[in-house]
A protein has these predicted regions:
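Conserved pre-ATP/AMP-binding loop-to-beta segment of ANL
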Residues: 57-76, 82-83, 106-112
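Hydrophobic/aromatic ligand-binding patch that stacks against planar heteroaromatic rings
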Residues: 30, 131-132, 202, 221
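Conserved S/T- and glycine-rich ATP-binding loop of Class I adenylate-forming
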Residues: 17, 71, 77-80, 113, ...
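Short beta-strand->loop structural element characteristic of the AMP-binding/adenylate-forming
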Residues: 1-18, 85-88, 115-116, 137-144, ...
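Conserved AMP-binding/adenylation subdomain of ANL enzymes
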Residues: 95-112, 120-159, 173, 227
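Gly/Ser/Thr-rich phosphate-binding loop
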Residues: 154-162, 171-239
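Structural core segment of the AMP-binding/adenylate-forming
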Residues: 1-53, 65
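Short secondary-structure boundary segments
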Residues: 20-22, 43, 144, 164-165, ...
Length: 242
């Protein structure tokens, strides 16, 4: 873990590093060695030096002019062909992807997203978060995936995004019924292959078809099943994204 972090910080050369309070000791040593002098903490309980510093900031927001081709994020790949590579994503990449998916997936006023994905991955960090953000939607934020908690929260939501294993675990919950998903309109899966058995059981159990999509760290979303169609398992024919 420390070796990976040393590589990421050294490669990205960030001006600021934010970590959990319990990891401050070893993370700050790596950051200082790499030349990053600003290391702040942010805890799950909404405490930490980042918020302490923010409390003393001016209420005036100063906009920084940005072009579409300006770098917005460096997202590190899983490293399947060697060491993780930093995928350089621009502001134009992020904005166009969010705009296209908002239209294509039918985001609308009143939508509520259940977010139970890790935010170190493009699915949770950009696709889910930016979808809710650009639509101005409420988000039910879960720090980790808990199938029982997700089932309890389903009646409050309209959109859920997950990887196939999350759907398998939800299907193991007796509380997953058509009544529980009565307000849901969209279930999305990606990041790994969705088995046809899971696809069919989900549709039979809930009355909803899981919408499959495909993307990667370097491009965000590339293709997606149509939203307003009775799609087949494994069909991802239409190119989408930015």
């Amino acid at each position: 873990q420390s070796g990976e972090m040393e590589y990421f910080i050294g490669n990205a050369e960030p001006a600021v590093v934010v970590c959990s309070p319990q990891n401050f000791g070893w993370v700050s040593k790596i950051a200082f060695t790499a030349g990053t002098a600003n290391v702040f903490t942010l805890g799950d309980d909404r405490t930490g030096s980042l918020l302490d510093r923010a409390a003393h900031c001016s209420d005036t927001h100063t906009s920084v002019p940005m072009q579409a081709d300006d770098l917005a994020a460096i997202l590190y790949t899983s490293g399947t062909t060697g060491r993780s590579k930093g995928a350089m994503l621009t502001h134009g990449n992020l904005l166009s992807n969010a705009q296209v998916l908002k239209e294509y997936w039918g985001w609308k006023p009143g939508d509520v997203l259940i977010h139970a994905l890790p935010i170190f991955h493009v699915h949770g960090l950009f696709v889910a978060l930016h979808g809710a953000l650009i639509n101005g939607s409420k988000m039910v934020w879960l720090s980790k995936f808990d199938p029982k908690l997700v089932v309890r929260k389903l009646p409050e939501a309209t959109v859920f995004m997950g990887v196939p294993t999350l759907y398998v675990r939800l299907l193991a919950e007796p509380g997953l019924t058509k009544e529980a998903v009565r307000n849901m309109r969209l279930f999305i899966a990606g990041s790994a292959p969705l088995l046809i058995e899971t696809f069919n059981e989900w549709r039979e159990r809930t009355g909803h078809t899981i919408l499959e999509r495909y993307g990667m760290s370097e491009t965000i979303m590339l293709t997606s099943n149509p939203y307003a169609a009775d799609t087949r398992h494994g069909q991802q024919a239409e190119r989408r994204g930015g």
